[in-house]
């Protein structure tokens, strides 16, 4: 039973990594299509952005390798809210899905307001039930 759970967990982690890498590739295509508008004039700024992107990718890879050893798998799904052009802070919906046993999935839905430095501040207040 544990071996089946471990194999199932690895398949889910591999699938998640595939989705994340596809999203990263799509973002790279979008950035390269608008590169003339968004390219920083200073080369040091460009290298700093590349370093941050590499560090972020390393963090994702280390997190995914960490997930392979867990008996359960937590997943975080971010749903973007406001655009950056609006004056309101960026709002995300954070979905946490935990697989405890094969076939048993528990999910929590929390809304957070993320400020411009992208740190989690506090749960957003909801007007009513969805």
UniProtKB/Swiss-Prot annotation:
UniProtKB keywords: Membrane, Transmembrane, Transmembrane helix
Region (Disordered): 34-57
One GO cellular component, as annotated: membrane
Membrane topology (Cytoplasmic): 1-58, 116-130
Cystine crosslinks: none
Main location: membrane
Localization, UniProt: Membrane
Membrane topology: Multi-pass membrane protein
Residues passing through the membrane, by range: 59-79, 95-115
Keyword Transmembrane: yes
Extracellular side: 80-94
Superkingdom of origin: Eukaryota
More info: Present with 238 molecules/cell in log phase SD medium.
Protein name: Uncharacterized membrane protein YNL143C
Organism: Saccharomyces cerevisiae (strain ATCC 204508 / S288c)
Lineage start: Eukaryota, Fungi, Dikarya, Ascomycota, Saccharomycotina
């Amino acid at each position: 039973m544990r071996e089946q759970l471990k194999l199932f967990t690895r398949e889910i982690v591999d699938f998640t990594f595939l989705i994340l890498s596809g999203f990263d590739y799509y973002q790279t295509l979008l950035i390269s299509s608008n590169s003339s508008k968004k390219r920083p004039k200073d080369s040091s700024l460009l290298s700093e952005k590349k370093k941050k992107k590499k560090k972020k990718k390393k963090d994702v890879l280390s997190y995914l390798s960490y997930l392979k050893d867990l008996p359960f798998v937590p997943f975080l799904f971010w749903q973007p809210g406001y655009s950056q052009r609006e004056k309101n802070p960026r709002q995300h919906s954070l979905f946490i899905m935990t697989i405890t046993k094969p076939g048993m999935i528990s999910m929590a839905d929390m809304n957070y307001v993320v400020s411009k430095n992208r740190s989690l501040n506090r749960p957003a207040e909801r007007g009513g039930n969805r």
